[in-house]
Amino acid sequence: MQIGVVSDTHNNLKNIDIIISLFNKENIDLVIHTGDVTNANSLEKFSRLKCKLIGVYGNNDRNEKGLEEVAFKYNFLFQEPPNSINLCNRNIAIFHEPDIIDDFL
């Protein structure tokens, strides 16, 4: 399984397009976004991915309107950090702020 990880896209639509093209070209199986999408339009761009997208909200996402609606519309699994998933019998922690790791462990 190939996993793509991205963070802090901060509404940079040009870079998001580049990221999506790269992940699609490399046949990535899953993309994990570790926060700071910052805008519903940015998150909607990720609908062009040819794989599943999961992630957590970052510190700049909490007050943005529309992120939850876009995540629901495209079946993206976005949650408040910390979060974890089990892939290939491995637990993977997903969080935005590095100081949260002590609470997670």
Predicted region positions:
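Beta-strand-turn-beta hairpins that frame and shape the catalytic cleft
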Residues: 1-4, 84-92
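N-terminal active-site segment of His-dependent metallophosphoesterases
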Residues: 1-49, 62-64, 68-76, 80-81
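Histidine-centered divalent metal-coordination motifs
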Residues: 10, 94-96
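Short amphipathic alpha-helix with an adjacent loop that forms part of the alpha/beta core around
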Residues: 20-24, 85-86, 103-105
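Short internal beta-strands
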Residues: 32, 54-58
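Conserved beta-sheet core of the metallophosphoesterase superfamily
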Residues: 54, 97-105
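Active-site alpha/beta core segments
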Residues: 60-61, 97
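Acidic/Gly/His-enriched mid-domain segments of enzyme catalytic cores or analogous surface patches
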Residues: 79, 83, 87, 99
